[in-house]
Curated annotation (Swiss-Prot):
GO terms for biological process: unsaturated fatty acid biosynthetic process. Homodimer. GO terms for cellular component: cytoplasm. The lineage of its organism: Bacteria, Pseudomonadati, Pseudomonadota, Gammaproteobacteria, Oceanospirillales. The active site is at residue 74. This is 3-hydroxydecanoyl-[acyl-carrier-protein] dehydratase. Keywords: Cytoplasm, Fatty acid biosynthesis, Fatty acid metabolism, Isomerase, Lipid biosynthesis, Lipid metabolism, Lyase.
Length: 175
């Protein structure tokens, strides 16, 4: 699998919103969620080469500011970003990659082998960085992406997810 001239190696927030509206990969193909569930502001690098396994990589960022919606409700007087939102962002990015390389279908998170949380995202943080290292992409009747991910806040690794799985489905009727 190699990139084509229509693919970009980075995407702005406006590009990501276009993906959420079905304007990037087509209406019945991979989409990102809309805000508030869109958990990144930009993709700074995406490639089908490189990364830890030589199969591709994605680097994306979320700017942290104290007025993000989740700080008001998680938790009162102890605001912290829910770790599950960081995990969801890694699934979002893996699904984006599957659409970016040209696979059809709607993305669904299918699982993760192991997740470790070793830090937290507080309202005083500045930037969350997601790094996705592709391990394998199966592009047959079933489209499946397998990857590892690291999430860091202000340069410190705080989450590790191994064996993320996302599938693309041309029909989700039986799902």
């Amino acid at each position: 699998m190699s990139t084509t001239t229509t693919q970009k190696s980075s995407y702005t927030r406006e590009d990501l919103l276009a993906c959420a509206h079905g304007e990037l990969f087509g209406p019945n193909n991979a989409r990102l969620p809309l805000p508030n569930m869109l958990m990144m502001d930009r993709i700074t690098h995406i490639s089908d080469q490189g990364g830890k396994y030589g199969k591709g990589e994605i680097i994306a960022e979320l700017d942290i500011h104290p007025d993000l919606w989740f700080f008001d409700c998680h938790f009162e007087s102890d605001p912290v970003m829910p770790g599950c939102l960081g995990l969801d962002a890694t699934w979002q990015l893996l699904g984006f990659f599957l659409g970016w390389v040209g696979n059809p279908g709607r993305g669904r998170a299918l699982g993760v082998g192991n997740v470790k949380f070793s830090g937290q995202v507080l309202p005083t943080a500045k930037k969350l960085t997601y790094r996705i290292d592709l391990k394998r992409v199966i592009s047959r009747k079933l489209v499946l992406g397998l990857a590892d991910a690291t999430v860091s806040v202000d340069g410190k690794d705080i989450y590790q997810a191994d064996d993320l799985k996302v599938g693309l489905f041309t029909s989700t009727d039986g799902f």
